[in-house]
């Protein structure tokens, strides 16, 4: 199976001023695309060549896992944001956040703290566990909740390439800007 770079759900300049067109040109057009290209170079002639992306992630190790997971993580991240995003969730997701964290404000503070304090490169995630409870986790490098049996609802990429053009070393400023873009409809659609 040959993988292709998924289309962004918005134009390259649609997230500005929070995330610039230049950042998306590099992050999506170069970084994400490189993971797709590398995965396509690594899987021919292996047991993974006819598997779906999710099957590869669940079974692979090393370079194949890293590139497959980064393709999936980035695609999920692009959908976690919207030019019409921000605000607060509604309906079932709002209720689940209040039940798990006490309030939206408490959730936002905990998620921001997790994202800001993730050491090195990684991801901050809002996930749903097997019991239906919501949790905030971080994964390092190419880690993904899928391999931990968790259902991803929302993610914030905290690899430096996600924010360095716009925010330099000010990760907390990038995280604050992320809240203006959060696609709550997408997060809600992932709720089981």
Swiss-Prot record:
Record keyword Metal-binding present: yes
Reactions catalysed: 2 superoxide + 2 H(+) = H2O2 + O2
E.C. number(s) listed in UniProt: 1.15.1.1
A Pfam entry, by short name: Sod_Fe_N
Cofactor: Fe cation
InterPro entries: Mn/Fe_SOD (IPR001189), Mn/Fe_SOD_BS (IPR019833), Mn/Fe_SOD_C (IPR019832), Mn/Fe_SOD_N (IPR019831), Mn/Fe_SOD_N_sf (IPR036324), SOD_C_sf (IPR036314)
Subunit structure: Homodimer.
UniProt protein name: Superoxide dismutase [Fe]
Organism encoding this protein: Legionella pneumophila subsp. pneumophila (strain Philadelphia 1 / ATCC 33152 / DSM 7513)
Lineage: Bacteria, Pseudomonadati, Pseudomonadota, Gammaproteobacteria, Legionellales
Gene behind the chain: sodB
């Amino acid at each position: 199976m040959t993988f292709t770079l998924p289309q962004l759900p918005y134009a390259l300049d649609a997230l500005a001023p929070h995330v610039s067109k230049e950042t998306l040109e590099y992050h999506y057009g170069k970084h994400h695309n490189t993971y797709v290209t590398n995965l396509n170079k690594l899987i021919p002639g292996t047991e993974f060549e006819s598997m779906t992306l999710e099957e590869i992630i669940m079974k692979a190790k090393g370079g194949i896992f890293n590139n497959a997971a980064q393709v999936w993580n980035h695609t999920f991240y692009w959908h976690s944001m919207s030019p019409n995003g921000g605000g607060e969730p509604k309906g079932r997701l709002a209720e689940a956040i209040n039940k798990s964290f006490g309030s939206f404000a408490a959730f936002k503070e905990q998620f921001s703290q997790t994202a800001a304090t993730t050491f090195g490169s990684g991801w901050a995630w809002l996930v749903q566990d097997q019991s239906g409870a919501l949790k905030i986790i971080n994964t390092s490098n190419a880690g993904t909740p899928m391999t931990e049996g968790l259902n991803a609802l929302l993610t914030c990429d905290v690899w430096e390439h996600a924010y360095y053009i716009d925010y330099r070393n000010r990760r907390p400023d990038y995280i604050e800007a992320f809240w203006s873009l959060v696609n709550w409809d997408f997060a809600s659609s992932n709720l089981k």
